[in-house]
Amino acid sequence: MLSKFTAILLAVHIALFACALTQAEKRHKLTRPAFHPNAPYLAGKRIVGGFVIDISDAPYQISLQYNGKHHCGGSILNSKWILTAAHCIDLYSEVKPTVRVGSSEHAAGGTVLHLLRIVPHPGHSSGGNNYDIALLELECELTFNDNVQPVQLPEQDDPIDEGTMGIVSGWGMTMSAADLNAILRATNVPTVNQQECNQAYQSYGGVAEQMFCAGYKQGGTGTCRNDSGGPFVAEGKLIGVVSWSHECALAGYPGVYARVASVRDWIRETSGV
């Protein structure tokens, strides 16, 4: 019979094994499920016209994965909680996602963790754009290092000044029909006038107060497919979550982001962060 000490050690090893999948296990998972957001302009998107960065430059960045394949981005809030876009977890009833942290590559390196709980914002409806925010609780706590760090959050209803420059990052497409980027990329874009953005998107229902827009009038750089859920960080704070747009970095159509400050109290009440 196993000694009590041996049994305890075995239980600990099993628990750790369940929390973080090894790279060998991930290679034997099923292929990526076919998934398309209900709204054609939702940005499962990618960084267009950006530049390669190391994960240590954005250590809060995570890859949300289905069947071992990158699907969306997200941000580390603390050792147990991740913030992403609500439309990124619409598949949860069919396929349980995992999270990769601490790697510049979405398909290798770092650590892959299981989720304990997924909490979409109560104001979000499947296929809709408003309150496109969800919290993910990890089964195991993260160990922080140079490649894994939480990002700071704004306070409830903190304003965003027009022209605020932010950095957005992800593994999304660099062209509308290209393959996923293997290496993390980023770009810098300014926030734009809310009324002008709302006018640009009138045929798509407009832009709500819980959203903001960022990009250049001439287009050319921004988010694209599979960047959704990723971070928009300005002055060290996560002020936006990549949500949707019309096409990718198209002139006249800036990217639309979920406004983190509009749900700050809900994040605190739900996660304690």
UniProtKB/Swiss-Prot annotation:
Bridged cysteine pairs (disulfide): 72-88, 197-213, 224-248
Limits of the Peptidase S1 domain: 47-272
UniProt EC number: 3.4.21.4
Family (UniProt): Belongs to the peptidase S1 family.
Catalytic center residues: 87, 132, 228
Function field: Constitutive trypsin that is expressed 2 days after emergence, coinciding with host seeking behavior of the female.
Site (Required for specificity): 222
Subcellular localization, as worded in the UniProt entry: Secreted
InterPro entries given in the database record: Peptidase_S1 (IPR050430), Peptidase_S1_PA (IPR009003), Peptidase_S1_PA_chymotrypsin (IPR043504), Peptidase_S1A (IPR001314), Trypsin_dom (IPR001254), TRYPSIN_HIS (IPR018114)
Record bears the keyword Glycoprotein: no
Species annotation: Anopheles gambiae (African malaria mosquito)
One GO location term (cellular component): extracellular region
Prosegment residue ranges: 23-46
Keywords from the named record: Cleavage on pair of basic residues, Digestion, Disulfide bond, Hydrolase, Protease, Secreted, Serine protease, Signal, Zymogen
UniProt keyword annotation of Secreted present: yes
One GO-annotated biological process of the protein: proteolysis
SMART domains xrefs: Tryp_SPc (SM00020)
Cleavable signal peptide: 1-22
Protein name: Trypsin-6
Catalysed transformations (reactions): Preferential cleavage: Arg-|-Xaa, Lys-|-Xaa
One Pfam family this sequence matches: Trypsin
GO molecular function, one term: serine-type endopeptidase activity
